[in-house]
Amino acid sequence: IPLDPVAGYKEPA
């Protein structure tokens, strides 16, 4: 999981 606050919104990594 990347350190993006919207990682789950863009791509469920």
Curated annotation (Swiss-Prot):
It comes from Lithobates pipiens (Northern leopard frog). It comes from the Eukaryota. This is RNA-binding protein. The keyword RNA-binding applies. Belongs to the fetuin family. Keywords: RNA-binding. Binds to the VCAM-1 5'-UTR region. One of its GO terms (molecular function) is RNA binding. The lineage of its organism: Eukaryota, Metazoa, Chordata, Craniata, Vertebrata.
